[in-house]
Amino acid sequence: RRGMEHGYALCVVDDEGEVICFFLLEPPGIPKMGTWDMIRAGLLGAAWKFGLASTRRLIATKDYFEASERRVLGARAGKVSRLNRLTVLPARQGQGVGSTALAAALRDVDAPVMLETQDARNVAFYERLGFAVVDEDTCPIGEYHTWSMLREGQISS
């Protein structure tokens, strides 16, 4: 819901009505979710269902990625669009669904876009769409490797 209120949310649906691709593209300047926003979005329920330790890890991970964005982008932090949650139904991966949908959205936005991925195979996928790795790091919460990638806007004529 947050992405649809504050940016570009895209669902690709097949002929049977099944969602086969989804992503959020948030424009710059969208306020980060604060503690109150997270509580309203169900944080207390998550703490009840998954426990306090898991909830603390969730908040620490969120804080880590926000700090990582500030470190990587420096003065540009908060002034760059963000790609979040690109997912394609496994049976439809490798068929051009995600790349076609994302390429169209990137043409519409025509501005710098940042993303993070924790899957090495995604790096080449995003590079084909004009993204470049600008940082690699290991998140201390969970010890997973993260690639931060940036795509500068294309100059339209």
Task: Label each region the model flagged.
Residues 1-11, 30-32, 78:
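A short helix-loop-beta-strand connector motif used in the catalytic cores of GNAT acetyltransferases and
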Residues 6-25:
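Conserved beta-hairpin
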Residues 8-10, 79-84, 145-147:
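Short beta-strand micro-motifs in enzyme catalytic cores
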Residues 20, 144-149:
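Short hydrophobic/aromatic beta-strand or adjacent loop that forms the aromatic wall/cage
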Residues 24-87, 93, 140-141:
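Conserved acyl-donor/pantetheine-binding loop and adjacent beta-alpha core of acyl/acetyltransferases
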Residues 80-81, 107-119:
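Conserved GNAT acetyl-CoA-binding A-motif
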Residues 85-88, 94-107, 128:
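Conserved acetyl-CoA-binding loop-helix of GNAT-fold acetyltransferases
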Residues 99-100, 119-137, 142:
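Conserved active-site alpha-helix within GNAT-family acetyltransferase domains
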